[in-house]
């Protein structure tokens, strides 16, 4: 049950997610992006994985902080390991981010599930076999064919309802859209 190795592998995957100048996500044409998988391995060969982006699992951060805390430790001590890793954040000059801690936490839970041959939702007490999902609409934009008007939001919401969603979460317009925010436009979109 002792963690003996921490590895990061990179691969290409296809996404339709694009970001504007303020970092807000928008749909767009498919394109290739670099993706990373963080793997924790134990002495008996079990592995736990977490998929993330390369910036979250940079080699320096993994070597200096994650490996230092995890290697030689019992993976079942998830809470203590998380706190030990969080302790290093303060002195890391913002290199060890909450997202890195989250990626490690997911890999530890995945490792626990694989070791016990149980899905993680059962390990944390889940009892439902299905849950309702809501459709989340990306931020508004000024792009042709995007979410530039309240009517665009309405059409997209109708598409989500036709797909079976019972609830919809709106993200309306914000900078860098030139005229945002505008409460009247937000209300129209709703």
Language model region names:
Residues 105-140, 144:
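Glycine-rich, aromatic-flanked loop segments that form ligand/cofactor-binding clefts
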Residues 130-131, 135-190:
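Metal-dependent enolase-superfamily TIM-barrel catalytic cores that perform enediolate-based chemistry
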Residues 41-116:
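Metal- or metallocofactor-binding catalytic centers and their adjacent structured scaffolds
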Residues 1-49:
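Structured beta-strand/loop patches that form or line metal/cofactor-binding pockets in enzymes
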């Amino acid at each position: 049950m002792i963690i003996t190795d921490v590895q990061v592998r990179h691969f290409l995957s296809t996404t339709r997610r694009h970001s504007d100048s303020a970092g807000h996500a928008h749909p767009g044409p498919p394109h290739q992006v670099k993706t990373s998988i963080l793997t924790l391995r134990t002495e008996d060969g079990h592995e736990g994985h977490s998929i993330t982006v390369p910036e979250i699992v940079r080699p320096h951060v993994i070597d200096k902080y994650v490996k230092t805390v995890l290697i030689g430790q019992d993976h079942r001590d998830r809470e203590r390991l998380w706190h030990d890793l969080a302790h290093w954040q303060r002195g890391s000059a913002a290199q060890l981010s909450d997202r890195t801690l989250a990626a490690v936490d997911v890999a530890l839970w995945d490792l626990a599930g694989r070791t016990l041959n149980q899905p993680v939702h059962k390990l944390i007490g889940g009892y439902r076999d299905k849950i309702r999902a809501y459709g989340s609409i990306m931020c508004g934009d000024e792009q042709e064919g995007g979410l530039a008007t309240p009517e665009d939001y309405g059409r997209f919401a109708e598409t989500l309802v036709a797909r079976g969603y019972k609830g919809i979460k709106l993200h309306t317009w914000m900078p860098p859209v030139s005229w945002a925010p505008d409460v009247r436009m937000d209300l129209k979109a709703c």
